[in-house]
């Protein structure tokens, strides 16, 4: 089988193997995505109660930011984690954001993770993005498209 070139689709395919088997993957089963080359574009969010106190456990080098307001890519993904947990489904989102002060277009996937296979305790995120070209109009920040998985 040809290797999937897009990180988001590779991570989604790996996650779906577990979900199609009737359970969410455990953290140790997704750790390979948080290491190595792919890990630079991945993050892991710990879900805690109250949900507003959820926080990053791992943020890949390419997604790291000093402050996580919702107009940054990492902050935007963090703000979506509670919806993923309550829906008990993954979500793919596309839109515009700021990464290290630059405008980008992105495609991200947020996927529930459960240590016991049932109770969601983390959300795995993976993101592909590109800088806006100078000849492209500046886009508003936020989500342009959402697809529940």
Task: List where the protein language model places each region.
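Intrinsically disordered, low-complexity terminal regulatory regions
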Residues: 1-68, 75-149
């Amino acid at each position: 089988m040809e290797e999937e070139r897009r990180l988001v689709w590779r991570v989604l395919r790996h996650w779906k193997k577990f979900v199609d088997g009737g359970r969410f993957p455990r953290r140790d089963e997704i750790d390979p995505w948080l290491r190595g080359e792919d890990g630079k574009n991945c993050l892991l969010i710990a879900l805690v109660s109250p949900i507003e106190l959820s926080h990053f456990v791992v943020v890949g080098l390419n997604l790291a930011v000093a402050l996580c307001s919702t107009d940054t890519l990492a902050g935007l993904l963090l703000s979506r984690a509670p919806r993923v947990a309550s829906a008990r489904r993954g979500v793919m989102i596309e839109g515009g954001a700021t990464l290290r002060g630059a405008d980008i277009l992105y495609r991200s996937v947020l996927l529930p993770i459960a240590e016991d296979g049932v109770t969601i305790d983390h959300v795995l995120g993976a993101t592909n993005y590109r800088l806006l070209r100078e000849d492209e109009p500046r886009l508003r920040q936020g989500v342009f498209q959402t697809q529940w998985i």
